[in-house]
Amino acid sequence: MSFLNSSRRRTRSPSPGQIFAPSATPIVIDSSPSVPSASSILDSLLGEFSEARDPYTVEAGPTGRSSDHLFSSPGVLTQSPGRENVPPRPSERTKDAHGKDRFLVSTERNGRSPFRGNPYRSAEIHSPKGRLKAPTKEGGTRKTKKFSSSNRTLTGRSTKFLAKTASKPTQSSKVPSEIPAAKLDSLQWEDGELRLELATTRRGSWTPIKDTSIDIVDPTRNLSPSNVSAAGSQKFSSMLSDYGFTKGSTLTMENELRREVPTTKRRLELLQGTANDIFSEGDFSRPPEKSVVNPNGTHSRRSRKTTSTTITSLSTAQYGHQDSRQMSNLADFFPSGEAVERPSGAIKKLKTSKSGTKKKGVKKAKEAPLFKVASIEDALKSLEDQVCLFGTSSQLERVSSDEEPQMANFNLNAQFPRKNSRPQKTRSPCSNPKTSKSLWYASSRGYDDIEFVDMIDSSNPKTLESVEASTFVTPIDSSPMHSQVASQMVFENPCDVSHVLTKIPQTGPKDPIENPVCPEIQIRHSGNVKTQSTSGQSIPSFRGLTTAQLAQKVASFGFKPLRSREKMISLLEKCWESQQQTHIPAMLPASHTALPDSVTRAEQMSKRDTIKSRDIRASKSRSNSNHIPGLVSSTSQNTGYAAKSPDCIRGSSKSNDIGTTQGSPLLTTQSVIVIPDSDDSDNDNNPTGGAYSYPSLASNTPSSSTRTMASESLLSVRTRYEANVGEEQGSNDINQQITKAIRAQPRLVAINGVKRPTWLEKILMYDPIVLDDLTVWLNTEGLDQIGEDSEVSGTTVREWCESKGICCTWKKKRHVAP
């Protein structure tokens, strides 16, 4: 302890009074770091146990002097060597007036406390409230830096801006000489004037003047790095070229996009406005464009063409690089001639260059077809050829030809011939059109609820005249009588044949055996005579056809093609047999659709009124046969052809008057006798009398079973046809009355806020019409509103709905009685 005390007394620092005492000897402050003394180490050990005191108070020593080494440290002190009594503060560095770094109070120098290790640094510390003030040095000159006001900085913060301004006092005040001091003092803004001139000069005094000169860029010149000198102008020109404001930058931008970005979508190009730039000759002759399209370039520029094998490649194939071709097609619609012609030549050059890389032998590539907008006249002509189909979705059909749209309006009324309403090209109910039929046709039924079945081969459709000629025409005798009449019987238009019958010669063979066959007069538009017998037809050989032809034949009969070839052949044979048995009675009503001439009808009416009984009519028919004495009856021969009796002549004359108006031949099958209908049925159903009475057929001689069945079926068809023709005019009137009644129905009153639509409103809204309800309404209210005292049946209402294209249905599935 004695050693420590002696060393402490030996190294004790002098008091502040001794340091700053006036002396002639200059004091040199040692700036080199020194080793900490033992006293400082001891104070650091003892300072940890001392109480907290004010660090700026000075205690008096035993001699009564102030001792700076007894400063009490604050409550929290640092524990590092040399900083025991210094409160922890961040080290703040500042610069003095000479630009040298200088630490503030918290800095440590020479490894000692600023108060104890280096007492001379206490002069730089300005304590608050003037506790420790460093006295100024008076006396001789010192070599050290002077303690001036510029060196005395506060301990709070460090401001570098003040140090810089202190070192440069001349640059901070620049007031122009043009503004006098008196004028600056009088700058007051109460008068409301802005004084822009003074404000501009004041702003110029402290704001540096910038270079506001604008670079003028010529958009017509070729902007390249060699031509542009300034870096700013290059950047500005590149911005212009990116937006396509110059001529030379459009194609270069396209080339860069094609080389770098492999796009998969079509890029939109401007045609109007920049069309002259795009389609100019200079653009297509530039080296950048040739370098892209010309095959002499690198192979990496051209896209590799591969076959599309995936759905994605197939869907994106249309977005390829075909901009030039598409622009040429679009340019054709513009009126400018040069702008349209030049792209085609350029595109042709591009195509030949591309095709030359693929095939060396090909020199020219085919040009793309030019698509042009059709004129207004052509568009109107195409609209005239279109056929509009109206109806519900269940009534419209699929058509593939120009004639088949007429089948869309097909209904049950077409199943039965009407007076003066059947056109020449209208098909019979058993005809089979080439294309698919409508849904109404597929399930069409007659009045007796019998479904119509189509068994006719549609591969070679026969007309009405050809079927009748091939079925019912008998061979013409080569007698002189027919040679005189044949040339006079051919005429163009249907007309009365009464004057033709008068030209038949009155002379003929007296012996009935000499002329066993009754000749048949054939009247045709073409004048050609065809002789064919029904019995002479044989089953065609279906085995010689291919499978595809067999399937087509089966489909023509309305059946689906079968897998087995044998089954299709057997099915075709059955269909052919049924066709030969059914086409004779089915085609017969179609030959009597037209009315006879008025003169012939009046003559037959007068004859019909004079006949009262069957015997009288038979005797009168025999007596009337005297005007053609050359035609007599005879027995049947082995050839299968039967001769006509005088009764046959009478029946033939009637059928001739009726049938020849359509240009069809007379019908002769075998020896027949006249069996007219009863008077009651004719008077009730047929107002025109005997004009529609057809003789029935009966066999007097033995014949085959096939002819007997044909005769019976022909009789039944004729009987049904007479009844239908009698009701034809009445059905037309009923349809008109139903239409008037539905349109005349008044609007119904709503019940409990629920509207009740009329029948017309239901039809217009495509609501299914219940036939039972509509029939009841027509019979109770509808027909009475228009003054019609009659009733309609459900079948009649159904026929009317289908003729108008109205969707109808029954309330319950039931069998409709005929």
UniProtKB/Swiss-Prot annotation:
Residues 28-39, 306-316 have a biased composition (Low complexity). GO terms for molecular function: 5'-flap endonuclease activity. It holds the Pfam family Slx4. GO terms for cellular component: Slx1-Slx4 complex. Phosphorylated in response to DNA damage. It is found in: Nucleus. Residues 90-103, 604-618 have a biased composition (Basic and acidic residues). Residues 1-39, 53-151, 279-324, 413-437, 587-712 are annotated as: Disordered. Keywords: DNA damage, DNA recombination, DNA repair, Nucleus, Phosphoprotein. Disulfide bonds: none annotated. Its main location: nucleus. Residues 426-437, 621-640, 652-672, 696-712 have a biased composition (Polar residues). One of its GO terms (biological process) is DNA replication. Belongs to the SLX4 family. Regulatory subunit of the SLX1-SLX4 structure-specific endonuclease that resolves DNA secondary structures generated during DNA repair and recombination. Has endonuclease activity towards branched DNA substrates, introducing single-strand cuts in duplex DNA close to junctions with ss-DNA. Forms a heterodimer with SLX1. This is Structure-specific endonuclease subunit SLX4.
